[in-house]
């Protein structure tokens, strides 16, 4: 069956049930807007398992998501959504582009979590947007932006508590949202592809920065993370 959409890390397929899609997690790893690419055996299986566990965690905390269930080691069933073309980034610690933009040392704690919005457009390099830009682009209303902000901070609270129990700091993460019948829900994935996660004591990176910065084996790192949070693949 032909994918109705194929991105850098996942492919989406129709199912026989209206409003339900099948997500296939690929082994492709990319960084720097696709400039660095590699196929890493087993990556998709690990991301599927981790995302499944974290979406189930969101459900337990009453956060609405598109996730229905995991159906194989690489696949999930999800609700079909109309994606909002914004990436919602929540940051607790200065790292990556924020550290570079502010001239801060990576690892500097923020006084409070901040929420940033980026335009989902690969051709433009997913630029950082202000709320004025969002209004000009007409991709979300002021009310929707506030909903995205509050949902992002809610997810942050849940992740901070969960990973904190496993000795892991949540540095920052990227979320995507969509609409179902006008209601905004969490979509895409939550995985070490989309989060920065550091060991609390050693500051070891447990995320895609291992691939970005050639710090070691991505599958070993993701497998270690999955084991630490008590998850398992199918």
UniProtKB/Swiss-Prot annotation:
Q: Which InterPro entries match?
A: SAICAR_synt/ADE2_N, SAICAR_synt_PurC, SAICAR_synth, SAICAR_synthetase, SAICAR_synthetase_CS
Class of this enzyme: ligase
EC no. given is 6.3.2.6
Keyword presence, S-adenosyl-L-methionine: no
Q: Which reaction does it catalyse?
A: 5-amino-1-(5-phospho-D-ribosyl)imidazole-4-carboxylate + L-aspartate + ATP = (2S)-2-[5-amino-1-(5-phospho-beta-D-ribosyl)imidazole-4-carboxamido]succinate + ADP + phosphate + 2 H(+)
UniProt pathway annotation: Purine metabolism; IMP biosynthesis via de novo pathway; 5-amino-1-(5-phospho-D-ribosyl)imidazole-4-carboxamide from 5-amino-1-(5-phospho-D-ribosyl)imidazole-4-carboxylate: step 1/2
One GO BP annotation of this record:
cobalamin biosynthetic process
Q: Which Pfam families match?
A: SAICAR_synt
Asked whether the keyword Nucleotide-binding is assigned, the reply is: yes
Q: Name one GO molecular function term.
A: ATP binding
What keyword terms does UniProt attach to this protein?
A: ATP-binding, Ligase, Nucleotide-binding, Purine biosynthesis
Could you say which protein family the record assigns here? Belongs to the SAICAR synthetase family.
Which protein are we looking at? Phosphoribosylaminoimidazole-succinocarboxamide synthase
